[in-house]
Amino acid sequence: MKQYNRIKAKHPDTVLLFRVGDFYETFGSDAIAAAKVLDIVLTKRGNGSASEIELAGFPHHSLDTYLPKLVKSGLKVAVCDQLEDPKQAKGLVKRGVTELVTPGLVTHDHVLESKVNHFVASLHWTPKGVGLALLDLSTGEFQAAEGDARWIDRILRSLEPKEWLLDRRHEGDVRALFGDDVPRTTLEDWVFTKAYAEEWIAKQFGTGTLKGFGLEDAPLATIAAGAVLHYLDFIHHRETTHIQGCLLYTSPSPRD
């Protein structure tokens, strides 16, 4: 279990699907959650011993069936695969996380709903207003806005993002304004700073200015957009060339 524990420690807020032979196994609290969501058998490994731990798994060829169920239930999932042929391995088989899937960042056809956007939303709350950025990773559609809480709430209700990214300092403020019925991920406060956001926007779009996106006079929207790009990198979604711009909403309606 040392290899498992080492990998799990790097992804503590995910359900880790750990490839063992022809199965993906889950352990401990992950196994309890997976068994409940997937309606699979929950057993114990090392029953009665000091190393006793909950266990639940499914055949590897059923990943496309079970992964969508986990994600749609609001869970983040880390898929840990065998990185070498077990028959050729000298000692312990090398394993590593090959994919991270969150409720708001998916590209799997089995998870995506036809003709429906699948947004992750970043919310930057301040006493003077709220910045918002929304990204559909499957299409590259990237949008931003800033304004009072009422307008931001209208956009959220219209576009129904699957996951919120929040500054951990202001999670309570956001929940009070917009509710808490959407899966949330909290990020460190330094992610939500203008200079850091501008670095990410410049890196993503190869530009030294925000003028082409209308963000030069929208600092709250800029910060929210930067947090989304940071999150993509944080969970190792590095294929972002299809995200080619960011549309700033300036109208009281996201569809005007």
Please state what every model-predicted region is.
Residues 1-251, 255:
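Charged catalytic and DNA/RNA-contacting regions of genome-maintenance
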